[in-house]
Design a protein with these regions (language model features):
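Polar/charged low-complexity regulatory segments
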Residues: 1-284
Length: 284
């Protein structure tokens, strides 16, 4: 994410402030309060995002708990508990794959704030990479300390404007089939929840960053409704997998463990017949 946006100075200042916050120590209550105090979105949206964060926390807790022998059953229970609040939970089926890059405000955040976009996607990469690392640790001792490796790579990615060349910040949205394939193999539903949450977060930031939008609240509510709807499966599973993998492992932040020194893809998602033509008006 080395490109410059129109608000580079503001982005750099914001990243410095965010890094200071991230290095602090916070309780679970502090984290939940941060969602409630968010003035950018309404209470319903905050609750959806908070519930998603708690699901991700519960999922990681299952995999690091040595006393839980049947991880798959525990994950299935966590998924069922998460879905127990239908209004504030996203679907466990893939939504329309190209919605991320074809909705009217698509790429708004990445275009206006490329450094912060990479910052957000790096956070999402860590969610998936940490889960993949701890699952691998449970499967094979050769992957011991994988979570520490993933965490070190995370700090390398956000330690500078563009990240280190060996472990650059993601230039594509990280998705479970690419970054956490073992999670996807063990629980497609859990992986889909995380991917739907991360896509929704990206869509929300696109809407918030897009200039001269008068109905941001309505657009965000519509996006949340789309992702929390359980009535229809908007895309086929294979289309979802193709979309996830077309982003490339390297471009999505690289593997949690192991090495991948360059992109294994020669085209991005947007270049593979997934191009969104965005015309942004002058920022106010």
């Amino acid at each position: 994410m080395g490109m410059s946006g129109p608000y580079q100075e503001l982005e750099v200042q914001t990243r410095v402030a965010l890094l200071e916050q991230m290095r602090g120590q916070y309780s679970n209550a502090d984290a939940e309060a941060a969602y409630a105090d968010n003035g950018a979105v309404n209470r319903h949206v905050s609750e959806v995002l908070k519930r998603g964060r708690n699901f991700e926390k519960d999922l990681f807790s299952i995999y690091i708990d040595a006393s839980i022998s049947d991880k798959r059953a525990a994950v299935a229970t966590a998924v069922a508990d998460y879905l127990g609040d239908d209004r504030h939970s996203v679907a466990t089926v893939p939504k329309e794959s190209t919605y991320l890059i074809e909705h009217d405000q698509a790429n708004g955040f990445k275009t206006a704030f490329p450094l912060l976009s990479g910052f957000l996607w790096t956070q999402q990469w860590l969610q998936l990479a940490a889960l993949e690392a701890v699952i691998l640790e449970n499967l094979d001792n050769q992957f011991a300390n994988g979570v520490d490796v993933a965490l070190e790579r995370f700090w390398n990615k956000i330690g500078s404007a563009g990240g280190m060349s060996m472990f650059p910040a993601p230039s594509e949205l990280p998705m479970a089939p690419a970054i956490a394939p073992d999670l996807y193999s063990q629980s497609e539903e859990a992986a889909m929840i995380i991917d739907n949450l991360n896509i929704l977060e990206t869509v929300i930031t696109d809407i918030l960053a897009y200039p001269n939008v008068e109905n941001r609240g309505e657009l965000i509510d519509a996006a949340v409704t789309k992702f929390t709807s359980k009535d229809t499966e908007d895309t086929q599973q294979m289309d979802y997998l193709l979309f996830a993998l077309r982003g490339g492992i390297y471009n999505q932040g690289g593997p949690a463990v192991g090495e991948l020194m360059q992109s294994e893809r020669n085209r991005s998602r947007s270049a593979m017949n997934m191009q969104h033509s965005m015309i942004m008006s002058t920022p106010q």
